[in-house]
Curated annotation (Swiss-Prot):
Classification of source organism: Bacteria, Pseudomonadati, Pseudomonadota, Gammaproteobacteria, Oceanospirillales
EC annotation from Swiss-Prot or TrEMBL: 2.6.99.2
Protein name: Pyridoxine 5'-phosphate synthase
Listed pathway(s): Cofactor biosynthesis; pyridoxine 5'-phosphate biosynthesis; pyridoxine 5'-phosphate from D-erythrose 4-phosphate: step 5/5
Role played: Catalyzes the complicated ring closure reaction between the two acyclic compounds 1-deoxy-D-xylulose-5-phosphate (DXP) and 3-amino-2-oxopropyl phosphate (1-amino-acetone-3-phosphate or AAP) to form pyridoxine 5'-phosphate (PNP) and inorganic phosphate.
EC class of the enzyme, as a word: transferase
Keywords: Cytoplasm, Pyridoxine biosynthesis, Transferase
Gene Ontology BP, a term: pyridoxine biosynthetic process
Residues the entry annotates as binding 3-amino-2-oxopropyl phosphate: 12, 23, 197, 218-219
UniProt superkingdom: Bacteria
Protein family (similarity comment): Belongs to the PNP synthase family.
Subunit structure: Homooctamer; tetramer of dimers.
């Protein structure tokens, strides 16, 4: 694979902060984890600043913005508070995601069709701040078209249905749906990323989809890091993507 066509790896470090918050300690330090991930081959670092600050907090985001050698992708809800924070910190990338306080993790894609006016306004304000905006959406043509109409240059396809499939047939159906959505989005001129629920045994099929720009992967890497160490966990995922 040529370097120019390689699938980028965004490492989500939210669960480093989850471990810290479990005891209310100062450790482990998300910034330290981010730097290790970068050195191990991550192309970027993803963090989700949730409205309830259940893991990543404002201080983490500010320090990461000052210290990362690659780039930060800030996941956030499409709220006034988060848009103001992002415009102040100015990360290179923002991904607008749906958010519910009661959920354990993001449960589905953003409903761009049903909230087009507000999301378009968010995209405009973030874009004017020099931030490349992506929208985390399900693999549906209507949502892809709405994302383009909102002025978002990129989307992130929600791969949760594929990752959570209970049978091989169901998984293959979800994979076909994602492939079709990626091709459709590329035809609309969008940058296409993907993520959610990806791990060492299901990522390759997504990475092999033509036109995929970046995969954002977190929980599985941090889970493996608890056993093997973060450097090895990131290198293993990077090596997996490099086989494409």
């Amino acid at each position: 694979m040529s370097f120019m066509s390689r699938v980028l790896l965004g490492v989500n470090i939210d669960h480093i902060a989850t471990l810290r918050q479990a005891r209310g300690t100062r450790y482990p330090e998300p910034v330290q984890a981010a730097l290790v991930a970068e050195q191990a081959g991550a192309d970027g670092i993803t963090v989700h600043l949730r409205e309830d600050r259940r893991h990543i907090n404002d201080r983490d985001v500010e320090l990461l913005a000052q210290t990362l050698q690659t780039r930060m992708n800030l996941e956030m809800a499409a709220t006034e508070e988060m848009v103001v924070i992002a415009c102040r910190i100015q990360p290179p990338h923002c991904c607008l995601v749906p958010e519910k306080r009661e959920e354990l993790t993001t449960e589905g894609g953003l409903d761009v069709v049903g909230n087009k006016a507000w999301i378009a306004q968010c995209c405009q304000r973030l874009g004017q701040a020099g931030i490349e905006v992506s929208l985390f959406i399900d693999a549906e043509e209507s949502q892809i078209l709405a994302a383009r109409e909102c002025g978002a240059p990129a989307i992130e396809i929600h791969t949760g249905g594929y990752a959570d499939a209970q049978t091989i047939d169901q998984q293959q159906q979800e994979l076909a749906r994602i492939r079709s959505a990626v091709a459709f989005a590329l035809a609309q001129g969008l940058i296409v990323n993907a993520g959610h629920g990806l791990h060492y045994h299901n990522t390759l099929a997504i990475a092999e989809i033509p036109g995929i720009n970046e995969l954002n992967i977190g929980h599985s890497i941090i889970a493996r890091a608890a056993i093997t160490g973060l450097d090895e966990a990131v290198r293993s995922m990077r090596s997996l993507l490099d086989t494409v």
